[in-house]
Amino acid sequence: MSTPRGIRYIPAIDGLRAVAVIAVMLYHLGFSWIPGGFLGVDLFFVISGYVITRLLLDSIQRSGGLDLRAFYKARIRRLFPPLVFMIFVTIIYISIWAPETMRRFVSDSPFALFGGMNWWLVFRQTDYFDSISRPPLLQHTWSLGVEAQFYLIWPLILLLVLRQFGKAKIPGAALFIAAISGIALLLVSYEVDAANASQVSHVYFGTDTHSIGLFLGAALAVSWVPQNLQEQVNRRAQDFIDGIGVIGFVGLLGTFFLINESDPTLYKLAFPLAGLFGCAILTSIVHPASRFAPMLSSKVAVWIGERSYAIYLWHWVVFQVTRPAVDLEGSPWALYALRILVVFALADISLRLVELPVRSGLVEYWFKGMKYRTKNVQRRQKSTVVASILLLILGTSYISANAISQSDKEMAIIKQQLEQPIQPSEPTATQEGGLWVTGDSVILGIRYELDARSNIAIINARVGRQATELIEVMRADKANAADSTVIFNLGNNNKLTSDQVLAVFEEVKNQPKIIVVNTAVPRGWRDENNALIAQYAALYGATVIDWASISAGHPEYFAPDGVHLVPAGVRAYVDAITATL
């Protein structure tokens, strides 16, 4: 994600990186007005594909060949140290403030460090959009995995094409691979649609399905070389160059503001569109006659762009350990500002203290300079380095092991509380047909208390259940619950659409009484989901239990994930249900 300074430096590319990372940050902050901000990652892919391919081709042109060892060493030197720095600092922080995340963090770290995080998430069937509690703190490094695999294979393909077919065939090869990725994306996404699956991890995280942007950028890099373009062009050509950039930029903003994670076109169109719009912007801003490039070259944009890699690394971790109303209390806007400032501060520290010293060769120079010092000095320096590394490894190992042990004990207690029947409360009269109760893991957690107070005729709940699955379950169960009051929760596990909420209420519209519990999940979609639930509940005469309001200001109701309930929360939840019966 960093521009090598060996080729002509174009400030607007850093400005474009700033656009990408800001879009991703705003999306992960949970702002509903930028539902497609996650497509900033696809813009990063286009930029990386372009810059890396230009770097490779310039190297080949200068030396007549490609030193793969030097290339891979340079990539590791640029990307690895900031990642290691982030991981070590995060381990120290979460050992104190979020120990329940340590086990997953430690198990994910090797995959993050060695460029395989995306396939690890596919293997674990992690859905990028459906983590209702605290998501894995290294989940965002999936994109580093895709890029790392691109860095590994693309230079080899490039050399093969050059030797066998010549430079003229490279754009075709890049476009061919991009087309293969697009076909894989379509095939896998259609499979997901056909199966109505809740997990779409392969579509989002797979290198085969999500590398379109990288190879579109690579194809552009071969066919659109900045140093071969004329600085002086006629007005018509200049207008055309700028027009391409403006169209690409407006189109890109359109994907950010109009595409959302529930959009059925997400996997079929959004990724390729973001890549094509990114290419259009690059086509304009790398041209020396561009008047659009200065718009992306402001000092602020370049400052953010230069730190975009570190900002990307830090933003996800910081945002997930500082969730408003879960980890921190205070004014939402003040917390937004604070969290962004913390990310920028950490990114700046990373750039100055880690990235630049390594990138400039200062660290390497210090080690090479050892041989010119006296033997006593050499021994002291080597001993200091070895001792520091051992202390760092042993210290973080001890800290992480201690945090895992502490977290395991706490989670065992909470699991026992959630799974064991709670002391029965005073029974409540229910209708003759009993209760038909359905939903997700929150319903599973309250089933014993509700059963102790009421007559449950049917209960059907599952961890992670989304609206699409709930509709199918309701359709199957309603024949056996004709006379039952239906109680269900909605909106915890995914961003709802109007069609989904309408379909849910259509399935239960003939029940004697409809009770729906809204969501208090600490995700950006909560308020929008609750608004949809309230809207359709009013149309169908359903009773809404406003769990978001009831639980506000009561952190003692929740397990550490801020979603599932401990006994106090179970009682409050069931109290709200029985009050409506």
Give the positions of each predicted feature.
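Residues at alpha-helix caps and immediate loop-helix transition turns in enzyme cores, especially N-
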Residues: 156, 265, 296, 497-501, ...
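Periplasmic/luminal catalytic loop of GT-C fold multi-pass membrane glycosyltransferases
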Residues: 484-487, 496, 500-511
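Structured helix-beta-strand junction loops
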Residues: 116, 288, 307, 453, ...
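Structural recognition of the beta-strand scaffold that forms the well-ordered cores
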Residues: 45, 114, 436-438, 457-461, ...
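Extracellular/periplasmic envelope-modification machinery, especially enzymes
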Residues: 219, 259, 326-334, 344, ...
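Short amphipathic alpha-helical segments and helix-helix/interface helices
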Residues: 13, 241, 301, 447, ...
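Hydrophobic membrane-embedded alpha-helices
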Residues: 2-13, 19-403
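Active-site segments of SGNH/GDSL-like serine hydrolases
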Residues: 504-531
